[in-house]
Amino acid sequence: MRDPVSSQYSSFLFWRMPIPELDLSELEGLGLSDTPTYESKDSSSVGKMNGQASGTEQKNPEGDPLLEYSTFNFWRAPIASIHSVDLDLL
């Protein structure tokens, strides 16, 4: 069985750099300060921010300017366009 103390230091999560805290004042210059903040995967949510969207709003964020970058459709390859002339040849 692996020793939990020594395996702790050999893991990727121990040695990676922590993700820096997001400064909301920097978002004001980008025009994104009024967007809802999203809940972290941690269910404890000790550091919830004011103005955070509720669970139903997070599941259906209509009008979110960053939504197109967080969906599967943005990252997949575009669908090839087929013209009617090409379909007639098939």
From Swiss-Prot:
Induction: Up-regulated during neuronal differentiation (in vitro). The modification Phosphoserine is found at residue 84. Ubiquitinated, leading to degradation. A motif (Nuclear export signal) lies at residues 24-32. Residues 35-58 have a biased composition (Polar residues). It is found in: Nucleus; Cytoplasm; Cytoplasm, Cytoskeleton, Microtubule organizing center, Centrosome. This is Protein AF1q. Residues 31-64 are annotated as: Disordered. Its main location: nucleus. It comes from the Eukaryota. One of its GO terms (cellular component) is cytoplasm. The keyword Plastid does not apply. InterPro entries: MLLT11_fam (IPR026778), WRNPLPNID (IPR033461). Interacts with HSPA8 and LAMP2 isoform A; the interaction may target MLLT11 for degradation via chaperone-mediated autophagy. Interacts with TCF7. Detected in embryonic brain cortex. Cofactor for the transcription factor TCF7. Involved in regulation of lymphoid development by driving multipotent hematopoietic progenitor cells towards a T-cell fate. Keywords: Cytoplasm, Cytoskeleton, Nucleus, Phosphoprotein, Ubl conjugation. Belongs to the MLLT11 family. Pfam families: WRNPLPNID. One of its GO terms (biological process) is positive regulation of release of cytochrome c from mitochondria.
